[in-house]
Amino acid sequence: MKALEIAKVEFGNIVRSNKFLAIVAIFTLMLLSGLCRVTEPSAATLGVPSATTHEVKSNEKLCVKVMEAIGYSVLILVPVVAVMLGFDVISGKVEKGIVRTLLAQPVFRDHIIVGTFVAGLTSLLVGVAMPLALSLSLAVLLLGITPSLADIALLVTYLGVVAVFALAYYALSVFFSTVTGNSVKSLAAGILVWLFSSFMLPSLSTAIIRLLLGPPKFEQVQMGQMVVIKTDSEYMRKFTDLQSKILSLTLDYHFRVIQDQLLLGPGIKDYTGLVVLIAFSLATLIASFTVFVKREVR
């Protein structure tokens, strides 16, 4: 049995599983709930009864509206989807004796791990791309706007960036699954990394910077007859630089930087974050491959 044959069997098992269907359904519902904000009346339209969000914002790019609506949901939920799909990729097979059964046949270890990787990555792309494609299609219908070529290009770029972000978390989850050989430990490790990156480190970074720089410094600025107290610009510059360096240790930060570039400009100007996510994914998958091939399965 070759790696491709293993991948086909694995992919079929994954997409037919209740876990996969439940994850895709929940992800889709969360994205759709985020898109509901696109059609809500904005503050600018409250005083104009006949105006709608579409009429007021008709000059804005469709892709920007959609990305703003689902951006937070994508940032929070995509790592969860990736972790849930990857935490038992290897450990589950070890626990169920599938790996031992396969190795009893004329199958090489590298065929097993490569086939599993291919099936997992394909199912991940399907699990992320399908809800996003459905959400984007509904957004076009809700807004009643025909997307331009620039809109389509930017949305496709965004889908690609989301896929790379998902791949990074999936690779990390597979690594935990391979190293621990235990699905519970693997899931716990993946969730802890996600919680630390998304919620804990941003708060901790502020406390760490306060310890390094001391309390905020303020300066008085004369504005006409009023005196305005503002935070010292040099202090804020150092604060922002240190925070960026600390948060750059997380995958979420690099995705958020790329997402902000797509929201603010016509495209990605700095590819550093994208390179980091791709390099991390490749390095982690290679590490998982090495550990699995060299480890004895009892």
Stretches found by the model and what they are:
Residues V38-V64, L192-L195, F199-I286:
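Terminal transmembrane helical anchor/hairpin motif
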Residues A82-G86, L134, A171-L172, A188, ...:
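Hydrophobic/aromatic residues in alpha-helical transmembrane segments
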Residues I26-E40, H54-L75, V114-G181, G224-Q225, ...:
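Secretory targeting signals
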Residues D88-T122:
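Helix-loop-helix units of permease transmembrane domains in multi-pass membrane transporters
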Residues S17, G160-L201, T206:
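A structural motif at transmembrane helix-loop-helix junctions in multipass membrane proteins
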Residues M1-F27, V293:
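Aromatic- and glycine-rich beta-strand/loop motifs that create alpha-glucan
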Residues L75-P79, S91-G92, V161-F165, F280-S281:
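Alpha-helical transmembrane segments of multi-pass membrane transport proteins
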Residues T39, F289-R298:
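Membrane-interface capping segments at transmembrane-helix boundaries
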